[in-house]
Regions:
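Residue-level signature of catalytic and energy-coupling elements of molecular machines
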Residues: 20, 69, 120, 158, ...
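Canonical P-loop GTPase G-domain recognition
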Residues: 88-141, 146, 312, 322-345
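Hydrophobic residues in beta-strands of the RecA-like P-loop NTPase core, especially within AAA+ ATPase
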Residues: 92, 249-250, 318
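Short hydrophobic segments within beta-strands
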Residues: 9-11, 194, 283, 317
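Conserved G1/Walker A P-loop phosphate-binding module
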Residues: 134-264, 274-276
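N-terminal accessory targeting/assembly segments
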Residues: 1-100
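Conserved C-terminal guanine-recognition region of P-loop GTPase G domains, centered on the G4
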Residues: 17-25, 57-61, 74-88, 234-237, ...
Length: 345
């Protein structure tokens, strides 16, 4: 597989920098050649500062084979256009990168529809801006161009696509509600696994259900909810697992920081499995730095709040505790304010 050499531009914060690298490397053929950092990525012309943009342009000219610049923040069409014109290679922002990752991961019809919806939401605000940019660059409006008429047609077409996709997703939502009602009638309890991407959700899911779902350090390995049964029977020495009635375990889409609202909305029908669960296990990787855990914990709680999740159903679970000293567990619980006994986090 031919590698695509990219330059990452991100913030000089360790957590954000590491997450940015993870995102880029989640695209199978991407190779990070260099990382540039800057405190502010919201400058008017390029997103990044003019001096930093010129520094990157010089680096690209001196380094053969670089094909893309990834800016770890939201960029407007104008900023992307300006950067591409200056540097001479493709520029993508954080949201475009996440959408690209989604496309490489989607396997179910519903997941693909959700990604298409998110992409339309990403593109619609940019259409008229792109038209203005092309007009300013003296591209001929009209047939084959991006004149006002062409833009209006494209905009209406995207709105029709959006309506069609929402209708299909609503059909899937209704089917899910019927399934949920059937579960309630036969008294099937539902336990939902949520948390930051790569927190160990799928590992725990496989352990509890005897499944063999793919486990990967890459982000967004899971894009669709998977539900399997789990039966618990106790004795004094151990807990045995059997497929059967009693409890259903649900593995969900992994969370990530700075996920735009429209992307959360696109996956809302899938994430609703978390809302209707009888118990929600919020997983945190205890082998990470406590400060990173704190940030991820807050990010997860914010997303769950957006989904109107009942916090009384929520229990925080520390994973990978075999990799750390037991004393650190108490420090994590104290610093993150975890108090599962009172059902508050």
């Amino acid at each position: 597989m031919k590698l695509t050499k990219v330059v990452l531009v991100t913030y000089p914060d360790d957590f954000i920098l590491n997450e940015g690298k993870q995102l880029v490397l989640s695209i199978p053929n991407y190779e990070i050649v260099e990382v540039f950092t800057q405190k502010y990525l919201n400058h008017a012309k390029y997103g990044i500062g003019s001096g930093k943009a010129e520094e990157i342009e010089k680096f690209v000219q001196e380094t053969k084979g670089i094909e893309e610049i990834i800016v770890d923040n939201h960029l407007t069409s104008k900023q992307i256009y300006n950067l591409e014109k200056l540097i001479g290679v493709t520029v993508k922002d954080r949201e475009r990168l996440i959408l690209d990752i989604f496309f490489t991961r989607a396997t179910t019809v519903e997941a693909k529809l959700q990604i298409q919806l998110a992409e339309i939401e990403y593109e619609m605000p940019r259409i008229r801006e792109k038209a203005k940019l092309l007009s300013n660059s003296k591209e001929r409006a009209g047939k084959g161009g991006m004149g006002e008429y062409i833009v209006d047609v494209h905009f209406r077409d995207l709105k029709r696509q959006m309506s069609f996709i929402k209708e299909k997703l609503n059909d899937a939502k209704l089917k899910r509600k019927i399934y949920q009602h059937q579960r309630q009638k036969i008294k099937m309890y539902v336990v939902s696994l949520v948390g930051y991407t790569s927190s160990g959700k799928t590992t725990l899911f496989n352990l509890l259900t005897d499944e063999s779902k793919e486990i990967s350090p890459n982000l967004f390995t899971t894009l669709s909810t998977i539900t399997r049964s789990f039966k618990v029977s106790h004795n004094k020495k151990h807990i045995t697992r059997k497929k059967g009635e009693g409890i259903l375990i649900v593995d969900t889409v992994g969370f990530i920081s700075r996920l735009p609202t429209y992307m959360i909305d696109a996956f809302k029908s899938t994430l609703e499995e978390s809302i209707v669960a009888d118990l929600i296990l919020l997983l945190l990787d205890s082998s990470e730095k406590i400060e990173d855990m704190r940030i991820k914990h807050l990010n997860c709680l914010q997303i769950l709040e957006q989904l109107n999740v009942d916090k009384s159903k929520l229990i925080t679970v520390l994973t990978k505790v075999d990799k750390i000293d037991r004393r650190i567990i108490y420090e994590i619980v104290r610093k993150l304010g975890i108090n599962n006994n009172s059902n508050s986090n």
